[in-house]
Amino acid sequence: MVTIRLSRGGSKKRPFYHLNVADSRRARDGRYIERLGFFNPVARGQEERLRIDLDRVNHWVSQGAQLSDRAAQLVKDASKNA
C-alpha cells in the first residue's frame, strides 16, 4: 500500500520533516516515490513552517494512497491557509 507520511530530517533537538509518498513496507526515512512538501515544527521568525503541494496530494489520494494521521492534519492546515 502507498502512504503519504512524514520522514524525519534535521539534527538532534531540531527536527525537520519531509512529506513523502512511500510504500508502507519501507523504512520511515527510507526510499520514497515522491516528495510533496515539508514541515518545520521549530520555525522561527520569517522561516516557513509548512509547504505542501496540495494538487499532488489530491492526485495520490485519488490513486488510493492513505494519509498518516499527522500528515492528514498537516494537509488540512495547509488547505485552510491556501
Swiss-Prot record:
Signal peptide range: none
Cross-referenced Pfam families: Ribosomal_S16
One term of GO molecular function: structural constituent of ribosome
Keyword Ribonucleoprotein: yes
GO biological processes: translation
Keywords: Ribonucleoprotein, Ribosomal protein
Gene Ontology cellular component annotations, sorted alphabetically: cytoplasm; small ribosomal subunit
PANTHER family tied to this protein: 30S RIBOSOMAL PROTEIN S16, SMALL RIBOSOMAL SUBUNIT PROTEIN BS16M
Family as reported in the entry's similarity comment: Belongs to the bacterial ribosomal protein bS16 family.
Protein known as: Small ribosomal subunit protein bS16
Gene: rpsP
